[in-house]
């Protein structure tokens, strides 16, 4: 939950684990299915969650909460299941992995459309701000009204854009939209960096490492600062920042020892110690173990 790092294309993909706030209910059956049979969990999620939101939107296309939920659901499914499976399949079957990534791209693109629609529905100035090339802030709008609702829209739309960009195969029409990811995430951080246990801070690590306006040293320094803040905000109970930094920074810079250390630090976190992070940490644990099992594939 990249943002978003892949084993194939470095452009933004590190939110896979972070974005899986999937079923939002950390009940043991849900955790068991996710842990033991993620493909089955994906089919269930697609059948139930996506269909439910789609039906709600058909009844009322201007239902803002449903629009935001659809952005979240489509992005979660694409990142949490299709991209996650694609990353793993890349080591076994390149053709199948690319097919999964292409499927994910369609969901990301659809999520972006819903996100843009939600922006326009709230206030056309939102969308004008998003697509503009200037660096103007929109903090004043975020600080009023339904802040939590707006934060969710900003966060999930940023994730949708990030996913669409990273799964586009380098399509220029998507690559040029990368600044929108930074705009949305920075808007959240500028108002409340602790929102959702520092989720935007963690996502910004991946974005920063892919920001063409930064030198490698600048990107590394900013990412390190974001990582430390994310750890502080989450009280060190969330595995997400460790995995995001490991994949976005350590792997990119080919720092194998640092990569291993970060993943091992993440795995030392007791999943059961904090119910708030139990679901996302279950996903992160599985990915960390997979990364360590296949470490020679990522370092040369």
Question: Which residues make up each language-model segment?
Answer:
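Sec-dependent signal peptide recognition
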Residues: 12-20
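Short coil turns that delineate tetratricopeptide repeat
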Residues: 61, 123, 193-195, 235-236
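N-terminal secretory signal peptides that target proteins for export/translocation
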Residues: 1-12
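TPR alpha-solenoid repeat register
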Residues: 66, 198-200, 241
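Short coil/linker segments at helix-helix boundaries
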Residues: 31-55, 59, 73-187, 199-229, ...
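Acidic-aromatic/histidine active-site loop/patch
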Residues: 288
